[in-house]
């Protein structure tokens, strides 16, 4: 960590977790890579880059297509802006990145924005498929990917999602360890770690 160690307990002005539940018209919050979630994620990222330039930032998308849509949304929102600096002055090697769950290993940043990219299937149906997190082969592939994603932040994790994890009944999640761990992690972040 650049020869600096943040010891626990550390008094900071911001909690280490923040949950942004994206709401809106169903067509904007449903399906894979919901439009409203992409917009909200990039708004938060740009706000962080502008107002906290000392922090390095990354977005982790829970799918390849969702990562592509987030990159497009970032380009759209910054437009012709040339003054947006996307790395801390003292750490130019920690440039802002958007990665997906399967290619984030090895990258760390001060702040990680996790964008789940999975909205409800219909007005009355909760999504049960979460891409690579659904694969519990003998090596617990999905759980390992989730573990890598949630441990990339040095200071803070902010989750952006159309998923309200408290609407899920643990008994209806099936036997998949990764899927259950994902919903439990979302609950943990939404409660700010309590």
Predicted regions and their residues:
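ASCE P-loop NTPase helicase motor core
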Residues: 1-7
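Structural motif
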Residues: 58-60, 113-115, 150, 158
């Amino acid at each position: 960590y650049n020869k600096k160690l943040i010891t626990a307990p550390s008094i900071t002005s911001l909690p280490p977790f923040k949950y942004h539940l994206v709401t809106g018209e169903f067509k904007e919050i449903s399906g894979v890579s919901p439009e409203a979630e992409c917009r909200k994620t990039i708004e938060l990222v740009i706000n962080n880059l502008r107002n906290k330039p000392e922090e390095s930032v990354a977005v982790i998308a829970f799918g390849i297509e969702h990562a592509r849509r987030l990159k497009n949304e970032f380009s759209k929102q910054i437009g012709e802006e040339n003054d947006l600096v996307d790395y801390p002055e003292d750490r130019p090697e920690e440039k802002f990145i958007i990665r997906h769950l399967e290619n984030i290993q090895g990258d760390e940043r001060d702040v990680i924005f996790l964008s789940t990219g999975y909205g409800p299937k219909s007005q009355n149906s909760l999504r049960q498929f979460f891409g690579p997190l659904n694969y519990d082969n003998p090596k617990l592939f999905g759980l390992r990917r989730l573990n890598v994603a949630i441990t990339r932040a040095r200071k803070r994790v902010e989750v952006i999602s159309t998923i309200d994890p408290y609407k899920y009944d643990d008994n209806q999640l099936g036997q998949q360890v990764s899927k259950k761990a994902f919903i439990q992690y979302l609950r943990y972040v939404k409660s700010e770690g309590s």
